[in-house]
Curated annotation (Swiss-Prot):
<protein>
    <recommendedName>
        <fullName>Cytochrome c biogenesis ATP-binding export protein CcmA</fullName>
        <ecNumber>7.6.2.5</ecNumber>
    </recommendedName>
</protein>
<feature type="domain" description="ABC transporter">
    <location>
        <begin position="3"/>
        <end position="211"/>
    </location>
</feature>
<dbReference type="GO" id="GO:0016887">
    <property type="term" value="F:ATP hydrolysis activity"/>
</dbReference>
<dbReference type="GO" id="GO:0017004">
    <property type="term" value="P:cytochrome complex assembly"/>
</dbReference>
<comment type="similarity">
    <text>Belongs to the ABC transporter superfamily. CcmA exporter (TC 3.A.1.107) family.</text>
</comment>
<comment type="subunit">
    <text>The complex is composed of two ATP-binding proteins (CcmA) and two transmembrane proteins (CcmB).</text>
</comment>
<keyword id="KW-1278">Translocase</keyword>
<dbReference type="GO" id="GO:0005524">
    <property type="term" value="F:ATP binding"/>
</dbReference>
<feature type="binding site">
    <location>
        <begin position="35"/>
        <end position="42"/>
    </location>
    <ligand>
        <name>ATP</name>
    </ligand>
</feature>
<dbReference type="GO" id="GO:0015439">
    <property type="term" value="F:ABC-type heme transporter activity"/>
</dbReference>
<dbReference type="InterPro" id="IPR017871">
    <property type="entry name" value="ABC_transporter-like_CS"/>
</dbReference>
<keyword id="KW-0547">Nucleotide-binding</keyword>
<dbReference type="Pfam" id="PF00005">
    <property type="entry name" value="ABC_tran"/>
</dbReference>
<keyword id="KW-0813">Transport</keyword>
<keyword id="KW-0201">Cytochrome c-type biogenesis</keyword>
<dbReference type="InterPro" id="IPR003439">
    <property type="entry name" value="ABC_transporter-like_ATP-bd"/>
</dbReference>
<dbReference type="InterPro" id="IPR005895">
    <property type="entry name" value="ABC_transptr_haem_export_CcmA"/>
</dbReference>
């Protein structure tokens, strides 16, 4: 197993959102998080990524194993597409940005400042950063937002290649990405007692970015 979660309790601010969450993810496997809006998917991903401390339970994985992609793209607007990828590649100690550029068809945009990109182009660049992290576990929160059908397929292909290479992915998404070796986890049964699944304040979008 590359990640094991045991009896995890998660909170958003002072409010407990989830309790008793247990699952494991193996190398080469994708876990798709399901549940209604506000159920706690973002909170769970933030907790797995170490951005929010758990209230209880354990999360076991290798050190620095998780790359987290949040709702916001978190790009450096003044840097070009290539410079953004080079910046993150340097942070994570990797060198080659070419595979990331190729995977998301960013070559025609390589010299364009990120601040001048469309929403879909920004999303492609944000997701391309996953390929320069070198981290085996991808935790992804609604990663296909702003992507058209063609680029959603590109993203799915990138995840599939990551899985074939022995990586793993935990993805909160409402669409079928057609990934092999994917299974679903409905988090609705883990919603903390007394918190309605439809509570709009249970799990608002995270507006920062770990990547």
């Amino acid at each position: 197993m590359v990640l094991t979660v045991t009896d995890l309790a998660c909170a958003r601010g002072p409010a407990q959102v989830l309790s008793g969450v247990s699952f494991s993810v193996s190398a080469g496997e994708a876990l798709i998080l399901r549940g209604p809006n506000g159920a706690g998917k973002t909170t769970l991903l933030r907790t797995l990524a170490g951005l929010t401390p758990p209230l209880a339970g354990t999360i076991s994985h290798a050190e620095d194993a998780i790359a987290y992609a949040a709702h916001a793209d978190g790009l450096k607007a003044q840097l070009t597409v290539a410079e953004n990828l080079t910046f993150w590649a340097t942070i994570f100690g990797t060198l080659d940005i070419a595979p990331a550029i190729a995977a998301f068809a960013l070559a025609p945009l390589a010299d364009r400042p990120a601040g001048e990109l469309s929403a879909g182009q920004k999303r492609r660049l944000s997701l391309a950063r996953l390929l320069v992290t070198g981290r085996p576990i991808w935790a992804l929160d609604e990663p296909t937002v702003s992507l058209d059908t063609e680029n959603t397929a590109r993203f799915a292909a990138a995840v599939e290649a990551h899985l074939r290479a022995g990586g793993a992915a935990i993805i909160a998404t409402h669409i079928d990405l057609g990934l092999p070796n994917a299974r679903s986890l409905d988090i609705t049964p883990f919603i903390a007692k007394g918190l309605p699944a439809s509570d709009p304040f249970a799990d608002d979008p995270f507006l920062g970015a770990a990547l």
